[in-house]
């Protein structure tokens, strides 16, 4: 094959392979605002939720209000129909809460890309949490970060400071239990505006102890209403693997992306999802090695 043709083919292959290596692993949290079977019966709500979920490799839903599995099962069925090239599964907590109002934490994840290694309900012996975290450890497609622990929390506005300080104890518990320092704390923390002043926020253990990175910045609006501007929803990362692979983190403004009015968006939720993207380091290393081999294959052509 002539050199120029070989060169063109090699470059084309490199571009294809390297483009494939740019895909990120996305972890999300979303307060879906009293998600029930009757809410999912509204077609625009279902359609939008499915599109939001399809963005994420792991999604942690909060405010799932369902004593049965019907709501999540229906949502999962529609999600798997939406993109048949992917396979989604779920894991949920029991109903949690101190009053008659109770809700679940629900993990919806791409089982073709990740698997749950362990999970447990945090033992809140002192009743510090209204909805104690339901913790899960996931396998990731990365040699740098082979697994990560997710700790979701939906605080109550009147106890934000107490619950967020108690979340530090959950971190200690899970990191010792599974010998894993790569932990992501995420959810609707109510960590802003009237629920938590700047001074109280900066005095939290998760702010003063070393190693915790609040990747959803203060000042980011995670609310749908134009009349509010609060960073209620957060993602806090700990661990060298997480920091090494961190690519981006932000709220997902779904009304803007899907061209919804505020009223239409509020039928879904009054919160934006928050997302963090991790580089898929294993894939990138393999592709880099392949790229080197392809480039070396050009040398004989150049020398002849």
Curated annotation (Swiss-Prot):
The keyword Hydrolase applies. Pfam families: Exo_endo_phos. Keywords: Disulfide bond, Endonuclease, Endoplasmic reticulum, Glycoprotein, Hydrolase, Nuclease, Signal. GO terms for molecular function: deoxyribonuclease I activity; DNA binding. The keyword Signal applies. It is found in: Endoplasmic reticulum. InterPro entries: Deoxyribonuclease-1_AS (IPR018057), DNase_I (IPR016202), DNASE_I_2 (IPR033125), Endo/exonu/phosph_ase_sf (IPR036691), Endo/exonuclease/phosphatase (IPR005135). Glycans are attached at residues 92, 123, 229. One of its GO terms (cellular component) is nucleus. Coiled coil: none annotated. GO terms for biological process: DNA catabolic process. Its main location: endoplasmic reticulum. Disulfide bonds join 193-230. The active site is at residues 103, 154. Residues 1-24 form the signal peptide. Its EC number is 3.1.21.-. Belongs to the DNase I family. This is Deoxyribonuclease-1-like 1.
